[in-house]
UniProtKB/Swiss-Prot annotation:
It comes from Aspergillus fumigatus (strain ATCC MYA-4609 / CBS 101355 / FGSC A1100 / Af293) (Neosartorya fumigata). Its EC number is 2.4.2.60. Belongs to the THI4 family. This is Thiamine thiazole synthase. GO terms for molecular function: cysteine-dependent adenosine diphosphate thiazole synthase activity; ferrous iron binding; iron ion binding.
């Protein structure tokens, strides 16, 4: 179940430059109607204001106790999503809503989840999504603008509005845990009965603090931790320091012969190809988003986000198709 939305009076404010209309009403707090009546509660009382007393060790214990409860709970997960960009978060949203019984762990190397979806292209703030990706915006309640003269795409006034809304919904699900500032260093594997590396079963991920991962070359060895899961979904983006990690690891494991390598920018070709081909590329490992372009040699798409969102939807669908079978195989 989605978390309850804050109740505000709607105020529609489309961008005049786009000659647009907002198809999902924007919501801003109306003066004097704050749901929590914060000014009524605190206003004019600051001279007597005081926080409840606390001892520093209470904070340390509460914080670490809660975190280690999550570590213990999600050490055996049902699905692990690697990468919390627009594709990974969309995947998590669909999965958590469809299957509240599944434990879903999201691993994100950065302190701040969201990947490149905090801004549009070239550090511009607006986000463009080609139709029919606006269906997902309606699903999560993100307002967007459309231009009647250009009906094939919609515009979100700030990419951060999309990312923050999606992230808040994902993290509100009780069956989802985000481990940020955490890097995936390797994959947990199981050999196939035939011994063929191409049939290797993926059975989880090997993790470490990102700061440790970044300094393996200049510090003494620091062993990692593990999370078991019958299905891993990798959405780490195109090649980079942490990008396309699982795709590259499949090659070094001989599960995939070689990477296709991302081609030049072609929005029309790239977005359709990424969504249609999001799939299980190895037993227990589904790859979506721009990471898939490194496997299959698809074009890059640049600053248009519809394929990232809908690749996430398809990744969730693919995961649900194979979950029961992969769970049985991993239990053997």
């Amino acid at each position: 179940m989605s978390p309850p939305a804050a109740i505000f009076e709607p105020a529609v404010a489309p961008s005049p430059s786009l000659k647009a209309k907002v198809l999902v009403p924007e919501t801003v707090p109306a003066s004097g109607t704050s749901q929590t009546h914060l000014l009524d509660h605190f206003g004019g009382k600051w001279d007597d204001f005081k926080f409840a007393p606390i001892r520093e060790s209470q904070v340390s214990r509460a914080m670490t106790r809660r975190y280690f409860q999550d570590l213990d709970k999600y050490a055996e997960s049902d699905i692990v999503i690697v990468g919390a960009g627009s594709c990974g978060l969309s995947t998590a949203y669909v999965l958590a809503k469809a299957r509240p019984d599944l434990k879903i762990a999201i691993i994100e190397a950065s302190v701040s989840p969201g990947g490149g979806a905090w801004l549009g292209g070239q550090l511009f703030s607006a986000m463009v999504l080609r139709r029919p990706a606006e269906v997902f915006l309606n699903e999560i309640g993100v307002p967007f603008e459309e231009d009647p003269a250009n009906p094939n795409f919609v515009v979100v006034k700030h990419a951060s509005l999309f990312t923050s809304t999606l992230m808040s919904k994902v993290l509100s699900f009780p069956n989802v845990k985000l481990f940020n500032a955490t890097a995936v260093e390797d994959l947990v594997t199981r050999p196939s009965a035939s011994g063929d590396a191409k049939d290797t079963q993926i059975a989880g991920v090997v993790v470490n603090w990102t700061l440790v991962t970044l300094h393996h070359d200049d510090h003494s060895c620091m062993d990692p931790n593990t999370i078991n899961a019958p299905v891993v979904i990798s959405t780490t983006g195109h090649d980079g320091p942490f990008g396309a990690f699982c795709a590259k690891r499949l090659v070094s494991m001989n599960t995939v012969d070689k990477l296709g390598g991302m081609r030049g920018l072609d929005m029309n070709s790239a977005e359709d190809a990424i969504v249609k081909n999001t799939r299980e590329v190895a037993k227990g490992l589904i790859i979506g988003g721009m990471e898939l372009s490194e496997i299959d040699g698809f074009n890059r798409m640049g600053p248009t986000f519809g394929a990232m969102v809908l690749s996430g939807v398809k990744a969730a669908e693919e995961a649900l198709k194979v979950f029961d079978q992969r769970q049985r195989e991993c239990a053997e």
